[in-house]
Structure formats: structure tokens, C-alpha cells
Amino acid sequence: MSTLEHPLIDRFLDALWLEKGLADNTREAYRNDLQQFNAWLDGRGLRLEGIGRDAILDHLAWRLEQGYKARSTARFLSGLRGFYRYCLRDGLIAEDPTLQVDLPQLGKPLPKSLSEADVEALLAAPEVDDPLGLRDRTMLEVLYACGLRVSELVGLTLEQVNLRQGVVKVFGKGSKERLVPLGEEAIGWLERYLREARGDLLGGRPSDVLFPSLRGEQMTRQTFWHRIKHHAQVAAIGTSISPHTLRHAFATHLLNHGADLRVVQMLLGHSDLSTTQIYTHIARARLQDLHARHHPRG
């Protein structure tokens, strides 16, 4: 039996034809997808009926790097789900490995991003000679260096940042914790901000908030959004911008510089790889160095 062939694939497709009267073209597409997946698994010492969710996610990352479109991957996953439901129903496997794998979203527009030149212009917009401007510059640097959600950024406390190790501890959706590298540029701005500006903003008031407002309190997301829009106007950026735009730029630029999709998923705090797939219109190469070598400001 060649690595492409597998008796379970034929049995599944025959059952599908008998139960649903599947069109010949769809049936052959499913056959090709499943045979290709089986060959991919065989090359890694894995068996079609003995894999878990991680193997499927790894294969999805491989498909994306090979340039497969979202519609093609959606068809592949549809066939794969049907195959494993069939295996589960017949008692051939104990659990369905596709249950926690999301289908790619079709027709969803790409998130707005910025070019690296636009990001540089935005980062340079705040006047850093006063505490407010230095705070804003540092927030923008951290936002771009780490790809944080705005709620994660404004909620940062002093104890979440470790400048010696160069990482920030982030509590994302569902209180999931992740460590994200800061990079040299962001570390430098944080050191200057903590030395020159944060104390002036607090005015002697005790607080563990990393980026306090002028009242010494945690800044709201809406306030930071207005600050970003102001700096975007100063930088003459024509693209409509929001705090999330820099998160998109973080992901897009990392992938454009050769980052691995699974690493970007981890840095963004996405629970599923498919959420990160929308950025892969520019993904081309594997990551050689996790952050410092590939991030534009690493």
C-alpha cells in the first residue's frame, strides 16, 4: 500500500456517497485532500487514525505556507471532519481530533494595518520632551513591540514588566497568561519613561499602573484611542487608524519578516491557529529567530 492509499478513506467516501449522494467532483476533492494529508502524516511517522489536534494545526500551518487558499482549506477541514466523525461512529477512534479546530472564515476582509514607514512616523509623532508625550511614545512602542490588545496595554502594572529579562507578562482573554518579548527599542523607551515621566504623571499618588492618566489612574481604552488618532494626524497618516491597528501591524510585519505562524499565534494570545490565519497573506518563511532578529525594532 502506498503512502497515499488508506482503506479507511475509501470506506468513508463510499459511505458518504451512499448516505448523502455526494457529487463526484466533491468526492474526488475529498479523496485528494485526505490522501495528501495521509501522505503528510506518513512522512512524519504519524498514522491517520492515531493523531490529535496538534497534528491538524501543524498541517494547517503547512498548507498556509504552501499557499493554499482559505476556501481550499475549508473544504479540506470539512472532509476531514466528516472522516473522523465516520471513524468515531464506527468505534475506530476514541475522540474526534477536529472538534476544537475552527474552519477558516471566508470572505472576511483583512484587518487594517500600516506599513513599516507609517509605523515609524506614528511612533515619532509624540513630543517626548514632556511627560504626557513620553508616556504616549512609550505606550506606542510597547503596543507595536508586543502586539498587545489595548485592554492589555492600559491594564499593565509595574510588576508585569521585567526589563532585566526583557519580557512583559500579559493577562489576555479568559485571564490566560503569556510572556511576550519587548525588544531593545521598547525596553529603552520604558527605562526612560520610568525615569523621567511616570512620577510626574502620578504627582506623588501611589499606584502600580504602568501608564497612568493625568489623574494618576488607569487610562481608559477610549482615551488611548483618542491619543492615537491625534498622533496619527500629526504623522499625516491617511489610513483610518485605531489602537488595534498596531496589533495588526505587529502580526503582519512579523510574518512579513519570516515569522512562524504558530509563534505569532502564541505572541498574540490567540487560542486557535485559525484566528491568526487572516494575517498569512504575507507569510512566506519560517522563523529563524523568535523576536530580536525578525521584528523590525527587535
Curated annotation (Swiss-Prot):
Q: Name one GO cellular component term.
A: cytoplasm
> Keyword set for this entry?
Cell cycle, Cell division, Chromosome partition, Cytoplasm, DNA integration, DNA recombination, DNA-binding
The protein's predominant localisation is cytoplasm
Q: Domain Core-binding (CB) spans what residues?
A: 3-88
Q: Which residues form the active site?
A: R149, K173, H244, R247, H270, Y279 (o-(3'-phospho-dna)-tyrosine intermediate)
A Pfam family of the record is Phage_int_SAM_1
GO BP field? cell division; chromosome segregation; DNA recombination; DNA transposition; resolution of DNA recombination intermediates
As for subcellular location, the record says: Cytoplasm
What are the Tyr recombinase domain coordinates in residue numbering?
Answer: 109-292
User: What is known about its subunit structure?
Assistant: Forms a cyclic heterotetrameric complex composed of two molecules of XerC and two molecules of XerD.
Check the record and name the PANTHER family matching this protein. PHAGE INTEGRASE-RELATED, TYROSINE RECOMBINASE XERD
Q: What's the protein called, per UniProt? A: Tyrosine recombinase XerD
Q: What is the lineage of its organism?
A: Bacteria, Pseudomonadati, Pseudomonadota, Gammaproteobacteria, Pseudomonadales
